[in-house]
C-alpha cells in the first residue's frame, strides 16, 4: 500500500468509506466473503482505500449496514446504517452525512475502490470552492462515479425528503435532483502495465479481483 497525499489546508473535511452491497456477484463466482475484505497484496482491499483516503481528510470512518465487527482491525470508527424502511446506498449516504454533520464537507468512497487518486480530495474541494456546488462527483473515462464525491453536510434534510418520495433510489438521481458538478480525473498509469487503468476501478467479480492484483503488483514495483 502507498499512502495518499496530505489534504489541502483551509477546509475541514470528513471522509466516509461506504461498505455496502452484498458481494453477491463475487460469491456467485466462487469467492466467499465480503469483496472489500479480499486480500490484495499484503492487506485487504479496504485497507488500500483507507491508506489512500486517510491522509486527505481530517477524520475518517466506515459505514455499513452489516456486522460492524468486521472492521475492528482497521482502527476506524464504524457507523451502522440508520434504520429506515427504505434501503440501498442512499441510506448509507444519509447515515454518513448525518454522522459527519459537525464538519461542513463529506468525502465519500466505496470500500472496493483500492486505487483512488491521492489528490482526490484537493481536486474535489477546489471545484467546490470555484462553483459553490453542494455536490461534486468524480468522473473518469466519461463516466460519473456517484459513490465518489464531495457532499455538503447540510444536504441531510434534502436527502431525508427525497427518501420519502423518490421513485429512483440511487445516489446519481438524488445528485441530479439537487444539481452537481464533476471533476474529470485522468486514467492512471503504472510502469509495468501495458494499458492505463481507471483510478475508480472497483471490484465486483472474481476477474476484477485478479485485475486489481495485477495493478497492485505493478504499483508496488
UniProtKB/Swiss-Prot annotation:
Species, as recorded: Brucella abortus (strain 2308)
Pfam entry (one): NTP_transf_3
Gene Ontology BP, a term: bis(molybdopterin guanine dinucleotide)molybdenum biosynthetic process
Molecular function (Gene Ontology), one example: molybdenum cofactor guanylyltransferase activity
Protein EC: 2.7.7.77
Keyword Cytoplasm in record: yes
The protein's role, per its UniProt record: Transfers a GMP moiety from GTP to Mo-molybdopterin (Mo-MPT) cofactor (Moco or molybdenum cofactor) to form Mo-molybdopterin guanine dinucleotide (Mo-MGD) cofactor.
Subcellular location per the Swiss-Prot or TrEMBL entry: Cytoplasm
Domain of life the protein comes from: Bacteria
Comment block on domains: The N-terminal domain determines nucleotide recognition and specific binding, while the C-terminal domain determines the specific binding to the target protein.
Protein name: Molybdenum cofactor guanylyltransferase
Keywords (A to Z) from UniProt: Cytoplasm, GTP-binding, Magnesium, Metal-binding, Molybdenum cofactor biosynthesis, Nucleotide-binding, Transferase
Residue sites binding GTP per the record: 18-20, 35, 63, 81, 112
Chain sites annotated for binding Mg(2+): 112
GO cellular component: cytoplasm
Cofactor(s) needed: Mg(2+)
Catalytic reaction equation(s): Mo-molybdopterin + GTP + H(+) = Mo-molybdopterin guanine dinucleotide + diphosphate
Subunit structure: Monomer.
InterPro entries found in the cross-reference section: MobA-like_NTP_Trfase, Molybde_CF_guanTrfase, Nucleotide-diphossugar_trans
SUPFAM superfamilies cross-referenced by the UniProt entry: Nucleotide-diphospho-sugar transferases
Entry similarity comment: Belongs to the MobA family.
Amino acid at each position: 500500500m502507498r499512502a495518499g497525499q496530505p489534504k489541502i489546508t483551509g477546509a475541514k473535511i470528513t471522509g466516509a468509506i461506504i461498505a455496502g452491497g452484498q458481494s453477491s456477484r463475487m460469491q456467485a463466482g466462487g469467492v466467499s466473503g465480503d469483496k472489500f475484505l479480499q486480500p490484495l497484496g499484503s492487506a485487504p482491499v479496504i485497507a488500500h482505500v483507507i491508506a489512500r483516503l486517510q491522509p486527505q481528510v481530517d477524520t475518517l470512518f466506515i459505514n455499513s449496514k452489516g456486522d460492524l465487527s468486521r472492521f475492528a482491525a482497521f482502527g476506524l470508527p464504524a457507523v451502522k446504517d440508520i434504520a429506515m424502511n427504505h434501503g440501498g446506498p442512499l441510506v448509507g449516504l444519509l447515515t454518513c452525512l448525518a454522522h459527519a454533520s459537525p464538519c461542513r464537507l463529506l468525502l465519500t468512497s466505496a470500500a472496493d475502490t483500492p486505487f483512488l487518486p491521492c489528490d482526490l480530495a484537493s481536486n474535489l474541494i477546489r471545484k467546490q470552492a470555484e462553483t459553490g456546488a453542494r455536490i461534486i462527483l468524480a468522473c473518469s473515462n466519461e463516466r460519473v462515479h456517484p459513490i465518489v464525491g464531495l457532499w455538503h453536510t447540510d444536504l441531510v434534510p434534502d436527502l431525508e425528503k427525497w427518501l420519502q418520495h423518490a421513485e429512483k433510489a440511487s445516489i446519481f438521481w438524488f445528485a441530479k435532483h439537487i444539481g452537481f458538478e464533476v471533476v474529470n480525473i485522468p486514467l492512471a498509469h503504472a510502469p509495468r502495465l501495458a494499458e492505463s487503468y481507471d483510478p475508480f476501478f472497483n471490484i465486483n467479480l472474481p476477474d476484477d479481483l485478479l485485475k486489481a492484483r495485477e495493478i497492485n503488483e505493478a504499483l508496488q514495483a
